[in-house]
Amino acid sequence: MIFYNRVINKGQLKKLISWSFNNYGTAITAQMANKLKDLGFRYATKAGVSISVDDLQVPPSKRQLLDEAEQEIRNTTERYTKGKITEVERFQKVIDTWNSTSENLKNEVVRNFRSTDPLNSVYMMAFSGARGNISQVRQLVGMRGLMADPQGEIIDLPIKTNFREGLTVTEYIISSYGARKGLVDTALRTADSGYLTRRLVDVSQDVIVREADCGTKRGVMVTSMKDGDRVLIPVKDRLLGRVLADDVKDPKTGEIVTQGHIQAVKNQVLTEDLAKAIGKAGVENVFVRSPLTCESPRSVCQTCYGWSLAHGHMVDMGEAIGIIAAQSIGEPGTQLTMRTFHTGGVFTGEVARQFVASFGGVVKYPSNVRTRSFRTRHGDEAMIAENNFDMIILGVDGRKETIPIAQGSILMVQNNQQVSAGIVLAEVPKVGQVRKTTEKVTKEVASDLAGELKFAQLVQEEKVDKQGTTTRIAQRGGLIWILEGEVYNLPPGAEAMVKNGTRININSVLAETKLVTEHGGVIRISSSPLYSPEKQNETNVLAQATQESTIDELEASMTGTSAQLPINTEMPDNLPREIEVITASVRLDQAKVRLESISNREQYIIETQNDQRFALKVTPGSKVGNHEVIAELLDENYQTSTGGIIKYAGVEVLKRGKAKQGYEVVKGGTLLWIPEECHEVNKDISLLLVEDGQYVEAGTEIVKDIFCQSNGVTEVHQKNDILREVVIKPGKLHSGNYEIDLGDLTLMDGQIATPGEEVIPGLVTSELKYIEYIETPEGPGLLLRPVTEFHVPDEPGVPSQKSINSSIELRAVQRIPFKDGERVKSVEGIELLRTQLVLEIGEEAPQLAADIELLPDLEEEGIMRLQLVILESLVIRRDVVADTTQGSTSTRLLVKDGDVIEAGGVVSRTQILSKKSGEVRGIREGSEAIRRILIVREADLVKIPVNTLPSVVEGDLLVAGTEIAPGIVIPRSGLVSKVEETVLNDGSKGYQVILRKGRPYRVSTGAVLLTMDGDLVQRGDILVLLVFERTKTGDIIQGLPRIEELLEARKPKESCILVKYPGQAQVNVNDDNVEVSVVSSDGTITDYPLGHGQNVIVADGQNVNVGEALTDGPQNPHEILETFFNYYREHESAYEACLRSFEACQRFLVNQVQAVYQSQGIDISDKHIEVIVRQMTAKVRIDDGGDTTMLPGELIELRQVEQVNEAMSITGGATAQYTPMLLGITKASLNTDSFISAASFQETTRVLTEAAIEGKSDWLRGLKENVIIGRLIPAGTGFNAYEDALSAEINRLEQNWDDDLDIFEEGDLQSVVLDDQTARSLEFENSLNLSSANQNFVDSQGKPQSQSSFIDDSMSEFSPVKDKSGSVLDDSDFPPGNFDSDFPADNYDLEHEIDLEDDVYDGYDDFDENTPDLI
């Protein structure tokens, strides 16, 4: 073995260990790894590698790269301010410029390290794969680059510094956006990933290897997985450990591919060597067995699964491959990013290949070139090639270069144009590139200055959508000009006092507003807070002045906020904040209000002149509406001592009363009250101490711990042995000795007997009684119950009141809380009649609310009067000094306190004054209210003197840098407002151009216009929404959410349209709409109507196949399944159509899930995903049960349905019709055969209820259901599916047993892992020792082996070890011990080399750049 003089990095270490493991087994590899570790540590302790600040070398060319980028951006900004490009194009250009700068700087960093300091510790760490990657090194010594904001949009201000130089404050804050996002992301990811794993385990836990070979002829075709040109997973990697379903033939020779003595024939397991041989032979499609097509019922067979990736041998029987698959997919979940990046349309460098001129010269196109003009995403004019041709560059020195241009390429140069070296000539789209779908997005353009709008070359059109809203759209692109001026916002209702063209000075009145009262009334100027003692005198004076007392509400919380900006207000300081107009008021002039303490609660009591006492029910200072209760009479006269029955005698109430408020009395009369005591108990019947119908004395214990308060007869209510209530009815019981029919007694029940009436012969009443028939323990009887009478007057007394307007008054109302005949259950007394004071507001203003005010009395101290007022509050503008967009204001009050004002009267007037002198513009004549006024000031004009007649006329719009006369260019963009003659100093005639400053904004076609020609705008107003298309990156929904979307089989929001029948696509493009149809080979035409915003991605005349996408957007797996099923169903049986449509859907799901993991650089074997997808596509939905027992809508396994259908066709019955179903993992888990497993997952009650109703049985086939009920799981050692077959085999072995046979022949032993304590007692004849580094790969004389090397350039694979005679050695020649010096190296020849070359470092393309916070 020879010495291998090369740096061994991470990848090569992996290969070394893998080689050792495959060829020499576990024990030796473990020892070798141990020795390698010791070696590593030995050298690590001799020299340490650390990073110091000095190791971070910033490339010297950084400054120059940044300067170039900044210059480019300055040029772009200048083009933008001149209106040459739109805001979107500017943004795009800036982002692209910084992206390429960052990329160039990264290359520069690597070049700098390589050329100046290859032993730099940062460089060694990152590039050996020990720690860190190029992306992180770039942030340390390059520049951090562009970052995204919290919404995922890119901020066009890059971080130009790196961590070595330190970040500025701004950069630090931009940086922290991404960091915070990262933290939040990680926290969410862990939970999401865990839940995903749980669902996956649940759906696949019952997949166990139960048989050796299912014997299926089906399989799947394995190809390389690609993204555009880039191969993500080559075929050889996807084949490892699979079993071939068909022979693999070399495409060149047509012979079966062979590696060593192994042939790639059907049922052969693909080892690493064989897979590599197939890859080398250039075979692109290999037909292999797969869990997807395995025909084992409820499991997967060994052959379809292939190797167990844990040990690289065929999977064992009873292996729980479902759980392994679930964990393999779920575990890397935390490494997937969840964040979606809206890059604002940033293109990656992969989209197109650029051709750059390598030398200066002239561009020549052939004569047959067809091109059309095109505007690039940076706003440059270019052309698109419509056919293929060769572009030729002829150099000055006779050099010639030919560049092949493909159809669809963007040409940046014209024919015969002179170009210099380094100029981009063309961008050629990559062939077979992944469809980049686009989406329409809008970007707002805000005005940078205030002024007047003018549209130039802009053609508008109005569109009305289904809802009837009108949008104005730019039919042809153009410019929106803003001509500078000072714009004043006017408050609502302001009236302009000037006209267009008026010259005004500082403080001229521009407009005025009036404050008007709506209802009219008495003016009250609000200035005092509630109950302030120092304001007492003012209030008293005011009270006398307006014949009523007043007290202010609390300071109005409303301050004049309205739609316009605040005003600079010039106001006398004594101007009130608000003015109140009293529209109506009512006052209780004779009643006194006192604050009393009633049962530990403070309450306002109103005492009227006729000694009635009312309790105030509302708080002072609050507002009350029409018909609300203000106060309630405190009256003991209608109080009872217990509950009872109420009956009306002559009393009439309003029918529409609400029981909650009580029934309003319309006509007085008498209320009859029959008292009774009612105890609600709700206890066990055993606690009852009296009988039903028993007569008890007051104080008797009727139920444990409950005593009655009056004498009477008991009535017990019970239900289901629960005692509900006990009623004690007072009265006199008459029973037994009256000669009267029992029937007559019952007729008297519920009647009232008047005094002197004979109830039954011999029984005369002396007072009013209520008769009740009752059953007592002694027999039937009559109970004469006492009746109390309460008199109700027709009208209650109303306190005296004074009002200044008859539209508001207080009315006294009597209300009875119970209806006629109602039984009131109570032990305590209740109130039978309430007298309330209610507010009545007249017809004129029932919607207004009144304020409750308590006013101090002028004569008596400590006494207050109650007053209700209806106020209209008018807020006087007194806004703080705010914005320069406002003129200053002056406000004048036109009323005094106590004035009476008519409805519609003016209370105050506010004038808006100008701050600068100038000319008034922009007032629109017509009906619409004027909201803004523009003043053109001197500062908005530029005067340019010229000697000769200028080449411009009044009204021209010019951009900065335009020549207006020979040698004279204008410094600013703007509008020529005047060209006038002047006299120069020498007396000759000259000219003066007066330019009104302005600024153009470019508007692209299709933009939504939010302003109109001639509008006045303030700085920051949105002028227009630019509509543009940006590419959606393939994974706009990235990482975990995408995996979840696929495995839960969710329908994407806007999916693409799929081809239903193969044929030729026809695309017709009209002005606005695109029509797509497909013509099949038999001439049928299928139309495909496009949805809103869908873009066609097929060309006219292109051949399309079934299931292919016609438009952009994500594919819907349910639609794929349905499309293929409907297509195959026309030609094949339902079963075959089902299998083939499932196959298409499975292929889509496996590849999509793989793509997400690959985009994050995570490798997962296909077979794991296939096991999960198999579970998702196992069931079909029954459409028609035929003669079977299956019901429509049932979900049943396809295999099961097919067995039933086969039986039906034999017996001649009608078969079941079905449709394939794709179930998400959650749904599949809930639809498993085992209800125990499903119930333990989700919706436990529903699953168990359904199982009970259907009488289901659980056959305990999976792991979960066995774990739940505590049995041995049917996997691993508990695997018992083929017990019979196994026991038969054991019997056969026992019969053929030979005691003398030594089955452990020497040489048969594999290298065994000795992990028990007995290993030390075993003796090995010769032991291997890997220790001494110098003897690792040399022979005993120390000479390198001549015949082969540890590594050579052919770099095949590690191959078998031979001795000098050429015979291959097996593992027994290497006893598992130490590689000691007595290892006879001389005899052995390592012909097997380690394939390390693939991984030798060749640049840094393979370093991960997807760090989460960078783009």
Curated annotation (Swiss-Prot):
Q: Where is the composition biased (Polar residues)?
A: 1335-1351
Q: Which reaction does it catalyse?
A: RNA(n) + a ribonucleoside 5'-triphosphate = RNA(n+1) + diphosphate
* Its EC number(s): 2.7.7.6
Q: Which domain of life is it from?
A: Bacteria
What does the record say about how the cofactor binds? Binds 1 Zn(2+) ion per subunit.
GO terms under cellular component: DNA-directed RNA polymerase complex
**Cofactor(s) needed by this chain:** Zn(2+)
For this entry, list what GO says about its biological process. Answer: DNA-templated transcription
Please provide the record's keywords in A-Z order: DNA-directed RNA polymerase, Metal-binding, Nucleotidyltransferase, Transcription, Transferase, Zinc
Q: What class of enzyme is it?
A: transferase
Binding residues annotated for Zn(2+), in chain numbering: C214, C294, C301, C304
Gene Ontology MF annotations = DNA binding; DNA-directed RNA polymerase activity; zinc ion binding
Q: Where is this region: Disordered?
A: 1335-1390
Q: What does this protein do?
A: DNA-dependent RNA polymerase catalyzes the transcription of DNA into RNA using the four ribonucleoside triphosphates as substrates.
UniProt subunit comment: In cyanobacteria the RNAP catalytic core is composed of 2 alpha, 1 beta, 1 beta', 1 gamma and 1 omega subunit. When a sigma factor is associated with the core the holoenzyme is formed, which can initiate transcription.
Family indicated by similarity: Belongs to the RNA polymerase beta' chain family. RpoC2 subfamily.
List the protein's name.
Answer: DNA-directed RNA polymerase subunit beta'
